[in-house]
């Protein structure tokens, strides 16, 4: 685990974005942890979040021309990541996002920001069923652009309804790499360093045994 990944876990714990306990997911599964990126909800949170996304992007080595944030949750992520890339990595890249409802006045259309073209890096909070990615792919392909990759904050590394994860489905269906700031494996490595969190470690390991990919 790299220093920025450890720092991200601590940031998420401090903001109660990441919690350990017993939670029922939308799928009905009982999970020993819960991640709610919506609680990154202040200016400082967003500034820090952008730095972690930018760090993971640079670390990945994936070449891309533009950041795309799917509405709605991807919009502030794309914006803050673009700022962080410019401020901390000297990479001044364009970004854009979609509207859920196309405008019929003013500049019109369903996109805001830069023209959607070239190699697109899609940024979002998490991938649950992959629905937002599929909707975004329709937009990207309609503009003649290509998907360079997808970056999310957390990869839960767990099976969907079948034998593979929603993330593996996206990688298979679109031939792109999905990267994340942290994975379930990183969470377990972090818990292993914290004796006072041993009860959570056992529960998370058991969950991975049952649902992991």
Curated annotation (Swiss-Prot):
Altering residue 124 to N: what's the impact?
Loss of activity
Q: Where does 5-phospho-alpha-D-ribose 1-diphosphate bind?
A: 26, 72-73, 99-100, 103, 105, 124-132
Reaction(s) catalysed by this chain, per the record, are: orotidine 5'-phosphate + diphosphate = orotate + 5-phospho-alpha-D-ribose 1-diphosphate
Cofactor(s) needed, names only, are:
Mg(2+); Mn(2+)
* Co-factor binding details: Mg(2+). Mn(2+) can replace Mg(2+) as the divalent metal. The role of the metal is to bind 5-phosphoribose 1-diphosphate and form a Mg-5-phosphoribose 1-diphosphate complex which then serves as substrate for OPRTase.
Residue sites binding orotate per the record: 34-35, 128, 156
Pathway listed for it?
Pyrimidine metabolism; UMP biosynthesis via de novo pathway; UMP from orotate: step 1/2
One of the entry's Gene Ontology molecular-function terms is: magnesium ion binding
- Origin: domain of life: Bacteria
EC number(s) from the headed UniProt entry = 2.4.2.10
One annotated Gene Ontology cellular component of this protein: cytoplasm
Impact after mutating residue 100 to A: Reduced activity
The record lists the effect of residue 125 to N as:
Loss of activity
- Keywords on record: Glycosyltransferase, Magnesium, Pyrimidine biosynthesis, Transferase
Q: What is the effect of changing residue 19 to Q?
A: No loss of activity
State the CDD domains in the record: PRTases_typeI
Which Pfam families does the UniProt record give?
Pribosyltran
- What InterPro entries does this protein's entry cite? OPRT, Or_phspho_trans_dom, PRibTrfase_dom, PRTase-like
Biological process, per Gene Ontology: 'de novo' pyrimidine nucleobase biosynthetic process; 'de novo' UMP biosynthetic process; pyrimidine nucleotide biosynthetic process; pyrimidine ribonucleoside biosynthetic process
Give the HAMAP family listed for this entry: PyrE
The name under which this protein is listed is: Orotate phosphoribosyltransferase
- Origin species, per record, is Salmonella typhimurium (strain LT2 / SGSC1412 / ATCC 700720)
């Amino acid at each position: 685990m790299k220093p920025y990944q450890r720092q991200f876990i601590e940031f998420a714990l401090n903001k109660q974005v990441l919690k350990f306990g017993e939670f029922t997911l939308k799928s009905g599964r009982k999970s020993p942890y819960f991640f709610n990126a919506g609680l990154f909800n202040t200016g400082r949170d967003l500034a820090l979040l952008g730095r972690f996304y930018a760090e993971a992007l640079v670390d990945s080595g994936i070449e891309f021309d533009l950041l795309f944030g799917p509405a709605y949750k991807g919009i502030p992520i794309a914006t803050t990541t673009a700022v962080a890339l410019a401020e901390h990595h000297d990479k001044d890249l364009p970004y854009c996002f979609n509207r859920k409802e196309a405008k019929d006045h003013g500049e019109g259309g369903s996109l805001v920001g830069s023209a959607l073209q070239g190699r697109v890096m899609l940024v979002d909070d998490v991938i649950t069923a992959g629905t937002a990615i599929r909707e975004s792919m329709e937009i990207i392909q309609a503009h003649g652009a290509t998907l360079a990759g997808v970056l999310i904050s957390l990869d839960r590394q767990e099976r969907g309804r079948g034998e593979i994860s929603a993330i593996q489905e996206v990688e298979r269906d679109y031939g792109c790499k999905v990267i994340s700031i942290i994975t379930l494996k990183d969470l377990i490595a972090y818990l292993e360093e914290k004796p006072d969190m041993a009860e959570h470690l056992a529960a998370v390991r058991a969950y991975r045994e049952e649902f992991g990919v």
